[in-house]
């Protein structure tokens, strides 16, 4: 498996986390301000290069009923911009309850970074189950 970068998209901030090369661990990485801006997208492209990520997973904020709303549409559009800016494949992954989980877990990393790590953990876990 290769490194995977996960992003917890928000209008003001975007948390980022990266996997280890074996796809076992998700580590909170950083928070990017204004991720939809040209500077924010360039910062994400830089993270992709620096980490050697070959795939980016963007959290898809579905409702508790599993439906898409305005935030999900924004995440889909953001994923397209990330793919173009970073030149890598981008997947969307259900992020329901990741922010509340990040709030409960605490730690030295910021809440957005922890939410991105939770998205990545969930994505990695799903891949292990499918094997």
Predicted regions and their residues:
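Phosphate- and other anionic-substrate recognition elements at nucleic-acid/protein interfaces
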Residues: 2-7, 11-131
